[in-house]
UniProtKB/Swiss-Prot annotation:
MF (Gene Ontology): nuclease activity
An annotated GO cellular component: cytoplasm
Main enzyme class: hydrolase
Protein name: Putative pre-16S rRNA nuclease
Gene Ontology biological process: rRNA 5'-end processing
Keywords: Cytoplasm, Hydrolase, Nuclease, Ribosome biogenesis
Role this protein plays: Could be a nuclease involved in processing of the 5'-end of pre-16S rRNA.
SUPFAM superfamilies, alphabetized: Ribonuclease H-like
Compartment(s): Cytoplasm
Membership in a protein family: Belongs to the YqgF nuclease family.
Gene3D superfamilies found in the cross-reference section: YqgF/RNase H-like domain
UniProt organism field: Chloroflexus aurantiacus (strain ATCC 29366 / DSM 635 / J-10-fl)
TM ranges: none
Amino acid sequence: MNDQIILALDVGERRIGVAISDADARIAAPLTTINAHPPERAIAQIVRLVQERGVSRVVVGLPLTMRGERGPQAEVVQRFADTLSSALSCPVEMFDERLTSVAAEQMLRNLGLKPAKIKAQIDQVAASIILQDYLDARRSNPNRSHELPHSSD
């Protein structure tokens, strides 16, 4: 799995947390947080990050319900991922992100950060949790894929 840098996104209503893997796709790290609006600008920023960082794959956290079903927010994220997939030449995959924001907030609270600092970092930390979970799952089951098809236009 050498030279496979993977970018992960935690897509929210206002912000998109971004995390990146090391070149061996083993370790995830928070990268940045970008504004979700307007979506066209957010997608352009993600495309630029993919190009600048030599990313080979993008993972988008899919906010399923606790029962594993798609709710309204999952559909919004899916549409965003579909649009992003059309703008990129690398694969885009969806990955279950249940409870990652809760885990990120707890992790930041445990570090003793103040609420304003937590708010500033929670999205990218959640993205790094999504990415680390994805990397771990991929190592244990390398044949599983949630890749989105690219549009042919």
